[in-house]
Amino acid sequence: TKKEMYKQPLDPHLMDDLIIDCQSCSGICCIALYFSKIDGFPQDKKAGVPCLHLCQDGLCAIHSELTKRRLTGCIQYDCLGAGQIVTQSLYPKTMWQDHPDQKEQLFSDFVKVFQLQQIRWYLLQCTCLNGMEDLLSDLTQLLMEIESAFINQECLKNCSLSNMHQRANII
């Protein structure tokens, strides 16, 4: 049964860093990513171009109307906390508009952090599965390496995404 398959997480707060906090971000997802109107976004938009509803402060001008406007892409999108990691840890107090020379790298780093957060989410889910005790030290090691990539831009640059994917798949 499902109840027998899962156990309590080692630390219930480990998932906290995977919770989006748009108020602590600068709307990077609304700029860095490609949007398609057919997928429930307000417009067809190329990656690197700001959404037409993104305000200067990084917040959405129509956030309170997303449901009414049936913008399911916006409603369902979850960066798993990548936005706030980039804006608070890797590029603190850096608004992409104020630093056009860093814009491309910042957007690229956002995508990389998002992918690392996805790996992190799956690894944390594995720690809650019964029968994974033999793999716990490998899981913990990989989780710590991913978290250390978020210390600064240099650490993220040195983190091999393909290596992390490969190691996570082996576990």
What are these regions (language model features)?
Residues 2-171:
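Short loop/turn segments that flank or connect secondary-structure elements
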